[in-house]
């Protein structure tokens, strides 16, 4: 099977961007609680 690079990148971005966004919010919240 041929791997669709663009589809792979799009999927990776679709997963990583929201994850990074949530991590940033979590870190900011954790810092404020300190």
UniProtKB/Swiss-Prot annotation:
InterPro entries: PSII_PsbM (IPR007826), PSII_PsbM_sf (IPR037269). GO terms for biological process: photosynthesis, light reaction. Its main location: plastid. This is Photosystem II reaction center protein M. Belongs to the PsbM family. It is a single-pass membrane protein. It is found in: Plastid, Chloroplast thylakoid membrane. One of the components of the core complex of photosystem II (PSII). PSII is a light-driven water:plastoquinone oxidoreductase that uses light energy to abstract electrons from H(2)O, generating O(2) and a proton gradient subsequently used for ATP formation. It consists of a core antenna complex that captures photons, and an electron transfer chain that converts photonic excitation into a charge separation. This subunit is found at the monomer-monomer interface. The chain crosses the membrane at residues 5-25. Keywords: Chloroplast, Membrane, Photosynthesis, Photosystem II, Plastid, Reaction center, Thylakoid, Transmembrane, Transmembrane helix.
